[in-house]
Amino acid sequence: MTTIKADEISNIIRERIEQYNREVKIVNIGTVLQVGDGIARIYGLDEVMAGELVEFEEGTIGIALNLESTNVGVVLMGDGLMIQEGSSVKATGKIAQIPVSEAYLGRVINALAKPIDGRGEISASESRLIESPAPGIISRRSVYEPLQTGLIAIDSMIPIGRGQRELIIGDRQTGKTAVATDTILNQQGQNVICVYVAIGQKASSVAQVVNTFQERGAMDYTIVVAETADSPATLQYLAPYTGAALAEYFMYRERHTLIIYDDPSKQAQAYRQMSLLLRRPPGREAYPGDVFYLHSRLLERAAKLGSQLGEGSMTALPIVETQSGDVSAYIPTNVISITDGQIFLSADLFNAGIRPAINVGISVSRVGSAAQIKAMKQVAGKLKLELAQFAELEAFAQFASDLDKATQNQLARGQRLRELLKQAQAAPLTVEEQIMTIYTGTNGYLDSLEIGQVRKFLVELRTYLKTNKPQFQEIISSTKIFTEEAEALLQEAIQEQKERFLLQEQF
């Protein structure tokens, strides 16, 4: 028979009493009434906030979007296949946030900032709210520094500044993504952090973009946020805000950032799907009433910060797809009215072999020449005027049989100017090369060449100028002015190269 030692028992009880920690926890718990199509209806979550994260019994996270008198409408961040009717749901008391750090550079992540490139976890000590308020008027300053895209047509006639929002709009397969990716490639060595957000794209298209960045060394300063076409609507809706939060992290650390949204119309479609399933009343094109606010609160986060906040910047390039050139549809008109200008890509120009297929006539930058260096302003003013006159003349010349010599010359000049705007994909040009190209065209040095020879001549001229007249590049990059000395050097190079080129062509 075992003997019970009273002192041992009393010691154990005393220890347990000392270790007892009286902690009162209030947990807000509800019950699943209905689940399906990425939406759950919850009963009993009385004190949940709008936009609060809720956790289901089997681990799925959701966002409380509809707060109704009898239940709460929650959108699921996952397939939610294991959620059962009657299971419990817990309110977390948190709003959606993501970890942020320098370690994200060079990585491919999803809308929840989890890596999807198979290269392990990303370390981060800080976190940011996915949705945070845009900088106010006092916190900003006007845009004055250029963000070079490397594309002559844009940098000369539709210039983009750091902190600007410029829409890239056009039909499918007109090179919209190519313009955006070329801009990222051109930021190499410019100390600009780039974020590329792919919303509802094909996984193969995203992989192609990532491969291009890796081959060209652009992933060193780029983060790719990808939610492909098979992702749940909730994650497609969140992806742009995740990208903006990452770009903001760098912006508030006195860095310059560039963010590409490809494309917000897919985000609007995902939001429409969520809203209709939540039984919100539909409006124009079945979009909910707050679809304008969906995009405005995203794009307003792009800014050029004032000196008190460190002069960082976030430049946004949203890409919107139109249906057979219709820019008067709901989402295109919304985004046009939010942004500071648009670059319009035309299917007709693309099919005619003019690539990048930028329709300069209806594209506009509301920042204008404030976002150009002085040297570019000096040579580019003439280009836009001559191209506009050429477009008008070309339409007229189709009906006229006999044209006078001056008109013929103007048409010939216009055709050569159009030729110099053509560029291969993933071949951005430096500002110095652009200035040299525009000057050569607008001052008539290409007029004596055949149209087919123009591009070959310009490529050879760029190489010749770089090797034989390096002072030209030094003058432009140091002074930012197209000085008389630079002009003289350029004229010499053009004459010398033209003689060599014409001799080569004879043999």
Curated annotation (Swiss-Prot):
Record GO cellular component, one term: chloroplast thylakoid membrane
HAMAP family: ATP_synth_alpha_bact
Functional note: Produces ATP from ADP in the presence of a proton gradient across the membrane. The alpha chain is a regulatory subunit.
Entry annotated with the keyword Membrane: yes
Keyword Membrane attributed: yes
PROSITE patterns listed in its UniProt record: ATPASE_ALPHA_BETA
Taxonomic source organism: Citrus sinensis
Binding locations of ATP: 170-177
Top-level enzyme category: translocase
Gene name, Swiss-Prot/TrEMBL: atpA
Enzyme Commission (EC) number: 7.1.2.2
Reactions this protein catalyses: ATP + H2O + 4 H(+)(in) = ADP + phosphate + 5 H(+)(out)
Subcellular location: Plastid, Chloroplast thylakoid membrane
Superkingdom field: Eukaryota
Entry-linked InterPro entries: ATP_synth_asu-like_sf (IPR023366), ATP_synth_asu_C (IPR000793), ATP_synth_asu_C_sf (IPR038376), ATP_synth_F1_a_nt-bd_dom (IPR033732), ATP_synth_F1_asu (IPR005294), ATPase_a/bsu_AS (IPR020003), ATPase_F1/V1/A1_a/bsu_N (IPR004100), ATPase_F1/V1/A1_a/bsu_N_sf (IPR036121)
Protein name: ATP synthase subunit alpha, chloroplastic
Keywords recorded for this protein, A-Z: ATP synthesis, ATP-binding, CF(1), Chloroplast, Hydrogen ion transport, Ion transport, Membrane, Nucleotide-binding, Plastid, Thylakoid, Translocase, Transport
Pfam families recorded: ATP-synt_ab, ATP-synt_ab_C, ATP-synt_ab_N
GO molecular function terms attached to this record: ATP binding; proton-transporting ATP synthase activity, rotational mechanism
Xref: NCBIfam families: atpA (TIGR00962), PRK13343.1 (NF009884)
Family: Belongs to the ATPase alpha/beta chains family.
Residues marked Required for activity (site): 363
SUPFAM superfamilies (UniProt xref): C-terminal domain of alpha and beta subunits of F1 ATP synthase (SSF47917), N-terminal domain of alpha and beta subunits of F1 ATP synthase (SSF50615), P-loop containing nucleoside triphosphate hydrolases (SSF52540)
Membrane topology: Peripheral membrane protein
Subunit composition and interactions: F-type ATPases have 2 components, CF(1) - the catalytic core - and CF(0) - the membrane proton channel. CF(1) has five subunits: alpha(3), beta(3), gamma(1), delta(1), epsilon(1). CF(0) has four main subunits: a, b, b' and c.
